Every structure is written in C-alpha cells, then in structure tokens.
UniProtKB/Swiss-Prot annotation:
Taxonomic source organism: Schizosaccharomyces kambucha
Name of this chain's protein: Mating-type P-specific polypeptide Pc
Gene Ontology cellular-component annotations: nucleus
Keyword GTP-binding belongs to the record: no
Lineage: Eukaryota, Fungi, Dikarya, Ascomycota, Taphrinomycotina
Other comments on record: There are three genetic loci for mating type genes in fission yeast, mat1, mat2-P and mat3-M. Cell type is determined by the alternate allele present in mat1, either P (plus) in a h+ or M (minus) in a h- cell. Mat2-P and mat3-M serve as donor of information that is transposed to mat1 during a switch of mating type.
Molecular function via GO: DNA binding
Task of the protein: Mating type proteins are sequence specific DNA-binding proteins that act as master switches in yeast differentiation by controlling gene expression in a cell type-specific fashion. Required for conjugation and efficient meiosis.
Subcellular location, principal: nucleus
Segment forming the signal sequence: none
Compartments reported by the entry: Nucleus
C-alpha cells in the first residue's frame, strides 16, 4: 500500500461567507438605507401594504417625495445616514407624523389612502 495513503493530510477548505452566516431574526433586523428616498419609500410601502392600497405604489411614493418640502426630504436623508450607525425606528415615527400632518393639512394632490400605523 502506498505510504502516503496511511497518514491523511487535512487541507484547509475555503468556505463562502454566506455559509458561515447565521440567519437573522426578522424582529431584530436593522436595515441600512443608501439614501433618504429609499428609507421614505420603504416606510410608505409598509403603510400601503397594511392599508391594502397597492395600485401604483411606487409612482405614488415618487410623487409624494417630490411634493415634500426640502427640509423634510433633508431630514429623511439624514435619518438614512444615521441608520448606518444605530436603530432609527423612533426617528422614523416622528417623520411619519410629519407626513400625516402634511396629508391632513390639504396637501393632498394625490390619491392615497393611508391608515395610521402605530
């Protein structure tokens, strides 16, 4: 018998990082957003999903985003930057209240039925 076969040599095997990662629990997931519009759109999609109004959701998000005042859009963008470092759910709730107040103050040139989400 070949002497090399008697003492096997274990070689390191490179495994992809995806196999070593554990599946995240959805409840503890903190998403990192690239910019303010993506954060805004994700929150609005969640609200639209809960209210059942999905007709043209992406177009509505874009229309609403462009009708928001510059300072509100800047606040969403700063919040998206902050999401890289910490959980921003409380701050998102504050900005959603601003969005609701804009909708209730006659800023309604788009058809959107939003139910209040706690």
């Amino acid at each position: 018998m070949d002497p090399r076969l008697r003492a096997p040599i274990f070689l390191p095997i490179l495994t992809p990082e995806t196999l070593q990662k554990k599946k995240q629990i959805k409840g503890n997931k903190t998403t990192i957003y690239k910019n303010g519009f993506m954060l805004f759109r994700s929150r609005l999609h969640k609200i639209l999903n809960l209210s059942g109004d999905w007709a043209g959701a992406s177009a509505k998000c874009s229309i609403i985003w462009h009708t928001l005042p510059q300072n509100v859009r800047l606040a969403w963008s700063q919040l998206a930057e902050l999401s890289h470092y910490q959980d921003v759910r409380k701050q998102i709730a504050k900005l959603e209240r601003i969005l609701y107040s804009k909708r209730l103050n006659g800023h309604n040139n788009y058809k959107l039925h939003i139910s209040r989400v706690q």
